[in-house]
Curated annotation (Swiss-Prot):
Belongs to the TRAFAC class TrmE-Era-EngA-EngB-Septin-like GTPase superfamily. EngA (Der) GTPase family. It comes from Leptothrix cholodnii (strain ATCC 51168 / LMG 8142 / SP-6) (Leptothrix discophora (strain SP-6)). This is GTPase Der. Keywords: GTP-binding, Nucleotide-binding, Repeat, Ribosome biogenesis. GTP 1 binds at residues 9-16, 56-60, 119-122. GO terms for molecular function: ATP hydrolysis activity; GTP binding; ribosome binding. Associates with the 50S ribosomal subunit. InterPro entries: AAA+_ATPase, G_ENGA, GTP-bd, GTPase_Der, KH_dom-like, KH_dom-like_a/b, P-loop_NTPase, Small_GTP-bd.
Length: 448
């Protein structure tokens, strides 16, 4: 699983700037629970081949007992509990404060691995400004500048020290795919029906095992079989055994959801028909796309809305989830067990598409036919020339296209090629990556 790094500190020390520096984006997933005045932000970071999850928190005042700061402290404590490592940010220019001491005292009590980041240290490697922060008992303060990137790489290298990155998955043979369980993550906001759907599945299929989570951030893995096919359900709903059923613990963990998506082969994004597509739904969908996972969208409680609401919802899906237009959308009722057969077929089809072998001769022929039908646009006097294609990976399918002047191929033209490949191979429910590589021209000498 991806390691988790939490960023904590008092207000206005540059935590969000560091978060944006690490994630490279500002549209992070937010834990937008009702009543919270300051939320935890979640995003993906990557250092070389090591991927990780970053949590940005509000200004932390551990001893706050009322108002906004009490809620912010509660959120920060949750982030620390979910984290493998904590980056404690202080403001080197403002100097040491009583709040810094309070936070340090709290972090020491948690037993978490903590790195002290002395932020706003532009051009500063050591000196008296850093020395006073040794008083916090957090070890050596690391001089960083979130705004300029100074020292950030070293900081994250130290945070990830001792945490091995997960092994990359290799391509699978057809026999391996038949014998290997399909890992399925059920993702969605709280109360959209995840636990109801899972209970329905586990009630009608043979339950092989049930592995209780070791910590609050571990997803539950439930191996089970349906017919002659094996699956491993990665549950984010937070289920616990209660008699003969599994009861949902009313606690939504963004980290658990992101971990489950990363670990999954296929993600089932569950949306509540009575509430429509929310910002949180769109954020989770965007994360699925970024992770390159096969995805199926299921609209639960479809039976609870009228025809006008259904038309409105379908338009909302087309607009707000347009970037997942390759994903099948199915209407279900988990409670009434309606639409579950087609849902399983869509899940199987999505995984088959994500792992399909695409022969080089067919890819090249399709590429040349597509170019003959519609050439890439010229860039000045230069027109890109695309020569051949081959598969560069699975889950998601990666198609590598070789040619000349490929840097001038537009995103619009890449989408055109993707549509041609999808149509021919009947690929559904999976993202596709197209990589363009310049071909070596043997007639150009190295000296010219």
């Amino acid at each position: 699983m991806k390691p988790v790094i939490a960023i904590v500190g008092r207000p206005n020390v540059g935590k969000s700037t560091l978060f944006n520096r690490l994630t490279g984006r500002r549209d992070a997933i937010v834990a937008d629970f009702a009543g919270l005045t300051r939320d935890r932000h979640y995003g993906d970071g990557k250092l070389d081949n090591h991927e990780f999850i970053v949590i940005d928190t509000g200004g932390f005042e551990p001893d706050s007992t009322s108002g906004i700061y009490k809620e912010m402290a509660k959120q920060t404590r949750q982030a620390v509990a979910e984290a493998d490592a904590v980056v404690f940010v202080v403001d080197v220019r403002a100097g040491l404060s009583a709040q810094d001491h309070d936070i340090a005292r709290y972090l020491r009590a948690t037993g978490k691995r903590v790195l002290l980041a002395a932020n706003k240290a532009e051009g500063m490697k050591d000196g008296p400004q850093l020395a006073e922060f040794y008083e916090l008992g957090m070890g050596e303060p690391l001089a960083v500048s979130s705004a300029h990137g100074q020292g950030v790489r070293s900081l994250i290298e130290m945070a990830l020290e001792g945490i091995e990155p997960p092994e990359p998955e290799e391509g699978y043979s057809e026999e391996e795919l038949r014998n290997r369980p399909t890992r399925l993550a059920v993702a969605g906001r709280p109360n959209v029906g995840k636990s109801t759907l899972i209970n329905t599945w586990l009630g009608e299929e043979r339950l092989v095992a049930f592995d209780l989570p070791g910590t609050t951030r571990d997803a539950i893995h439930v191996p089970f079989e349906r017919g002659d096919k094996k699956y491993e359900l990665i549950d984010t709903a937070g289920l616990r055994r209660k008699g003969k059923v599994f009861e949902s613990i009313e606690k939504f963990s963004v980290v658990k959801t992101l971990q489950a998506i990363s670990d999954a082969n296929v993600v089932l994004l569950l949306i509540d028909a009575t509430e429509g597509v929310s910002d949180q739904d769109a954020h989770i969908a965007g994360y699925v796309l970024d992770a390159g996972r096969a995805v199926v969208i299921a609209i639960n409680k479809w039976d609870a809305i009228d025809s006008y609401q259904r038309e409105t919802l379908q338009r909302s899906i087309e607009q707000r989830l347009a970037f997942l237009k390759f994903a099948p959308v199915l209407m279900i009722s988990a409670k009434k067990r309606q639409g579950l057969g087609p849902l399983w077929k869509a899940i199987d089809d999505a995984w088959a598409s994500a792992t399909r072998k695409l022969p080089t001769p067919q890819l090249t022929r399709l590429l040349l036919e597509a170019v003959e039908y519609q050439q890439p646009k010229r860039a000045g006097a230069v027109r890109p020339k695309l020569r051949y294609a081959h598969q560069g990976g699975q889950n998601p399918p990666i198609i590598v296209i070789h040619g000349n002047a490929v840097e001038h191929v537009t995103e619009v033209y890449k989408r055109y090629l993707e549509a041609r490949f999808r149509e021919h191979f009947k690929l559904v429910g999976t993202p596709m990556r197209i990589e363009l590589r310049a071909s070596h021209n043997p007639f150009v000498s190295k000296d010219s």
